[in-house]
Curated annotation (Swiss-Prot):
Keywords in alphabetical order: Cytoplasm, Fatty acid biosynthesis, Fatty acid metabolism, Lipid A biosynthesis, Lipid biosynthesis, Lipid metabolism, Phosphopantetheine, Phosphoprotein
GO CC annotation terms, alphabetical: cytosol; membrane
Pfam families registered for this protein in UniProt: PP-binding
GO molecular function list: acyl binding; acyl carrier activity
Protein's recorded name: Acyl carrier protein AcpXL
GO biological process: Kdo2-lipid A biosynthetic process; lipid A biosynthetic process
Modified residues (O-(pantetheine 4'-phosphoryl)serine): 37
Biochemical pathway: Glycolipid biosynthesis; KDO(2)-lipid A biosynthesis
């Protein structure tokens, strides 16, 4: 597991009161963990703050709604963490 995943999983557990032990890299934030849109906004805000980045959530949501990508592309944790790592690298 990556340091990014560990931090993101901790943020999810703290923000949504989901048991940290149930959060895996394969977890889908909505389908598996049942995180609603308001909690997800809180999680994204906390991730932005923790990593010093800005997740383009509006763009991602639009791409999913337009059928350009599947929800798994952005909302399965291992993929989300990879996107966070890309955003961190682009900022560095």
């Amino acid at each position: 597991m990556t340091a990014t995943f560990d931090k993101v999983a901790d943020i999810i557990a703290e923000t949504s009161e989901i048991d940290r032990a149930t959060i895996t890299p394969e977890s889908h934030t909505i389908d598996d963990l049942g995180i609603d849109s308001l909690d997800f906004l809180d999680i994204v805000f906390a991730i932005d703050k923790e990593f010093g980045i800005k997740i383009p959530l509006e763009k991602w949501t639009q791409e999913v709604n337009e059928g350009k990508v599947s929800t798994e592309e952005y909302f399965v944790l291992k993929n989300l963490c990879a996107k966070i790592d890309e955003l961190k690298a682009a900022k560095a």
